[in-house]
UniProtKB/Swiss-Prot annotation:
Short name of one Pfam family: TGT
Pathway: tRNA modification; tRNA-queuosine biosynthesis
One GO BP: tRNA wobble guanine modification
Protein name: Queuine tRNA-ribosyltransferase
Catalytic residues (positions): 103, 277
Domain of life from the UniProt record: Bacteria
Single GO molecular function: tRNA-guanosine(34) queuine transglycosylase activity
Designated gene of the protein: tgt
Amino acid sequence: MDRQCAVASLTAFQFQIDRQCSQTRGRACSFHTPHGIVETPRFMPVGTLATVKTVTPAQLRDTGAQMVLSNTYHLHLQPGEEIVAKAGGLHRFMNWSGPMLTDSGGFQVFSLSELRKIEERGVTFRSPRDGAVIEFTPERSIRIQNALGADVIMAFDECPPYPAERKDVEAAVARTYRWLERCINAHERPQDQALFGIVQGGVYLDLRQQAARDLVQLDLPGYAIGGVSVGEPSEEIHRIVEATAPLLPAHKPRYLMGVGTYREMVQAIAAGIDLFDCVIPTRLARHGAALVKGDRWNLKNAQFREDFQPLDEDCNCYCCQNFSRAYLNHLIRSREILGYTLLSIHNITELVRFTTRIREAILSDRFVEEFGHWLQPSAVPVSP
């Protein structure tokens, strides 16, 4: 299926299938947004507070990143969406000219299990900053995201924990659908902000599948699979994606939220997923760890103290082109911020390059040949 083109109902957005893998449901696509094209499959770095931790926008561009994620909940608390709007929106505020996506804040709100109360209207919680009572509703989440101005915005959903009773997950799925309808009605910028719906359902595959079928009827510009990477085994994520992704429209972007390990991304891409985000690259960097050719290295280890080779001699990132493993070992042991910056640059480059290589393999129909080993049970994911 070469160059299949499907244009979303929004004039500023277009999603094009460039090549379909002949052996899996994987595909290479081009997602056109108001701020540029996202070539998928694609890993998106996380810039929660309008910054990818320890990395400048210029450095981020050099990693090959095309789309960046920020968070509605955190930006509402600091500095506030009004400030961002006065600056001209997120892109100008953080000096990022490429596409952006904002999460709805639902995941963060629901992670405050002891501080929040769920009702049909929305969620009330106490701010972890000052204890003030804050209410998040579908309408408020969308208003905040409209003010922030990202290219893609996410519906406010209820993310059940893991593990959770089936009845509780059923209630969360039903409420997520009702809240999505309210998000659609509240959305004031559909021409330049694409609203994605989120499929919930925990580890209950029948609930996931029914949720997907229901959301598809709303004909949104894109769809996400949420509520994963919340403590469940990697095998469960694979089961969820395998059961859910095929039910989402082939002519629209599919986004797997919060996933960014090598194996989990390859498995999801084989199932038809296009977009990923995860804090893994910067979180590992802050712990002195580097992602190198599918493995995880602890740069604090003594073995690197007199190792003057580049971190990865095959990597063209700023870190690997200019500094040795010994220097990185010194920086991390000294707790110098530069060490975290250099490892963040490398780790982001590594995951962006990994998904870029997968795209190239799909375009040449060599995906299974080049990445099939990650589909095997023996392939161990690199945990954050």
